[in-house]
Amino acid sequence: MEPSKGQERSLIKVRIELDPSMDEPEILIRAPRLTQELSQLQESILKQKLVPLAFYKDRSEYFLDLADILFFETDGEKIYGHTKDEAYEVKQKLYELEELLPIAFCRISKSTIVNAKQIYSLEKSFSGTSTVNFYQTHKQVHVSRRYYQVLKERLNEMR
């Protein structure tokens, strides 16, 4: 399928060069100009962490794939990461999670961060609060008016 008029077709060449003299990997992006796509790529790379996020339930510690996390939310003083079937406690604060999580995760209220890749639908209500529904679960969260537009933009970027 050819891009429509006004749409740029973005091609990115990826090359890995091994250099045993280096202490740590380095990523260099060369481009004729800075685009939104390159800025997002840079942000995504910078957010990648080698340290896995630990989740806790009862006396067990779990290392879950972030792709399985629907959302993080506060409940009193605790923060929970929700999968479609379970809720696990995490030790980080929401603002710390915002720094650690990949670009697919987006703040939608004072108490919730959502995984945009897991969103099935977004229902807007007359009261101004919208509801997020997820794939294959009954769990829902609410988007505050303040964060609604940010979420819509993130969802459009992820398409």
Regions found by a protein language model. Give the residues of each.
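Charged phosphate-binding loop/patch that engages nucleotide di/tri-phosphates or the phosphate backbone
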Residues: 4, 150-159
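Conserved binding/recognition cores within well-folded domains
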Residues: 5, 37-136, 140
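Intrinsically disordered, low-complexity N-terminal regions enriched in serine/proline/glycine
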Residues: 55, 146-147
